[in-house]
């Protein structure tokens, strides 16, 4: 039995009417995962035993008719802690780490009756934009297995796009939800910083990281955000939940909504077909009654440089805890304490992680702190101020999610800077702590193009409103890759 093309609401109705049980749905999902896994490599761990135990308990308690997520399977990125399920961050360093607690986002999802079916592959410690730095091998793009799926939440995006699961969780530090969502033709949202607790997320850049949802459609994405968003005493940066239902504006028209189109987002380095797709999308929003006008975000061009100083500096601090002593990988060829530290970290971390630790350590070092880290913080403030000026007059910002569609596997590994520039359009959103969504907006070379909508802080419901209006009047979200059963 397969439920690939059923929406969450359709699955909920089947569960409530007892046409299917949570156990049957979970078993079908596990079969979907396994049948596509050899082609995609989107999972690090398939949690079959734990998922079936959860499903049985939900069946025995009964499906909650008022809770649309009760009994629905969920895949979780492998840097988000799951009680009793390996959480490796796709690194040799944590190859055997099994948390004894759930991340708050996972605990919230379980409280809603969601069933964790596995941990998805990712760039190691979320450091990468292609899904290729994983210790467990690269994930493949759902549309073309010779292409990258984007990163770092590579497996979470590919799993949803391919029909392995309907919903998944990722994390976004510089575009790690939105870019793979764009490359795989699905909906991915980075919430406002603080909307979802970071407790239980293996930290990369603590001032940038945010957990968020993947789904095939806008409404399903919002339903998952409803489940995971919460204020949390265990995360001092979490914010009070302002709104009970992030779907509240879905279905409302967008007549009179003011949308800004930054000229910098369609400038140098943007693929011509991607640019054309976004300009066509802007015209579509105008047909729906929105007002679209060109604006400038003059400091956005410095975003990549600022990000790689700040994020790497925070990573060099956060990753100090992985020392071969308390948990994770320990080198066997060490004869003293210093060698345990050095050898365990040298052998346990991959090349990209070590590159960023060294970059961050350099940026924080005596004599360079003022020139790099402090200055990056000052430019970050200018980027934030650019957004504030635009949002004084506009409701949302529109642009491409990525400068290109998915590129060939192993084509940029020799050129880290070129890969870093692929996050040019998503990074400023993290630096400013803003919400941003990627939705399918067209195709180029047979591969999905993502449209990014950015809002002021705590404007997720407005972002969902505009995204849903676009989705309802286009059919890009209905296109499916061959592995899902589509014609493309």
Swiss-Prot record:
Its EC number is 6.3.5.7. It is an enzyme of class 6 (ligase). It comes from the Bacteria. The keyword ATP-binding applies. Gene3D superfamilies: Amidase signature (AS) domain. It catalyses: L-glutamyl-tRNA(Gln) + L-glutamine + ATP + H2O = L-glutaminyl-tRNA(Gln) + L-glutamate + ADP + phosphate + H(+). One of its GO terms (cellular component) is glutamyl-tRNA(Gln) amidotransferase complex. GO terms for molecular function: ATP binding; glutaminyl-tRNA synthase (glutamine-hydrolyzing) activity. GO terms for biological process: translation. The active site is at 77 (charge relay system), 152 (charge relay system), 176 (acyl-ester intermediate). Keywords: ATP-binding, Ligase, Nucleotide-binding, Protein biosynthesis. The keyword Ribosomal protein does not apply. InterPro entries: Amidase, Amidase_CS, Amidase_dom, AS_sf, GatA. Allows the formation of correctly charged Gln-tRNA(Gln) through the transamidation of misacylated Glu-tRNA(Gln) in organisms which lack glutaminyl-tRNA synthetase. The reaction takes place in the presence of glutamine and ATP through an activated gamma-phospho-Glu-tRNA(Gln). Belongs to the amidase family. GatA subfamily. This is Glutamyl-tRNA(Gln) amidotransferase subunit A. It comes from Streptococcus pneumoniae serotype 19F (strain G54).
